A protein has these predicted regions:
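Alpha-helical membrane insertion/targeting regions
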Residues: 1-144
C-alpha cells in the first residue's frame, strides 16, 4: 500500500480483505463447532471494522446525500444491520435465517469490492491498476 494512504483507508482495506478471506473460509469449511464460531466472530469483527471505518472515508464518487455521506455509506448501515440479524438468528439457533443474512452481507462485501476495484478514481482501482503494475514493472526491470 502507498505510504501516503490515509490511516482510515488502510484500516478499511485491511479489514475488508480480512473479511473477504475469513468469509471465503467460512463458506468452504464445515459449518459446525467451535472453529466455525471463532472464525465467524473474527469475520463479524472484520466486517464491523470495515463498515465503521467507511464513515471516515469519502465515497470518491462525487455524490453526497447528507453531511458528506453517500449511498455507499448506506450500504455500511445495512451491513451492520445484517450482521446484527445474523448474530441474532445464530444465537436463536435459526440457522436458515442466519445463513441468509450472512450470505447477503458477504455478497455485499464482494460487490462493494468489485465496484471499488472497477471504478477509476477509487483507491482500490489505483492500487490494482496503477500502483501494482508500476511495482511489477520496476521489479522486473531490476532483474535485467
Amino acid at each position: 500500500m502507498s505510504a501516503s494512504m490515509p490511516t482510515p483507508m488502510m484500516v478499511h482495506l485491511f479489514a475488508a480483505l480480512a473479511a473477504l478471506l475469513l468469509g471465503a473460509w467460512q463458506l468452504l469449511a464445515a459449518r459446525r463447532g467451535a472453529r466455525h464460531r471463532m472464525v465467524g466472530y473474527l469475520w463479524l469483527l472484520a466486517m464491523l471494522v470495515t463498515s465503521l471505518s467507511s464513515f471516515r472515508l469519502e465515497s470518491g464518487l462525487g455524490i453526497a446525500w447528507l453531511a458528506g455521506f453517500s449511498p455507499i455509506h448506506a450500504l455500511s448501515v445495512f451491513t451492520m444491520i445484517s450482521l446484527a440479524m445474523a448474530l441474532f438468528h445464530a444465537r436463536a439457533r435459526d440457522f436458515r435465517r442466519h445463513r441468509r443474512w450472512i450470505a447477503g452481507a458477504y455478497a455485499g462485501l464482494v460487490a462493494a469490492g468489485v465496484v471499488a476495484a472497477a471504478l477509476p478514481g477509487r483507491a482500490l482501482h489505483a492500487m490494482l491498476f496503477v500502483e501494482l503494475p508500476r511495482i511489477v514493472v520496476a521489479a522486473a526491470a531490476q532483474q535485467f
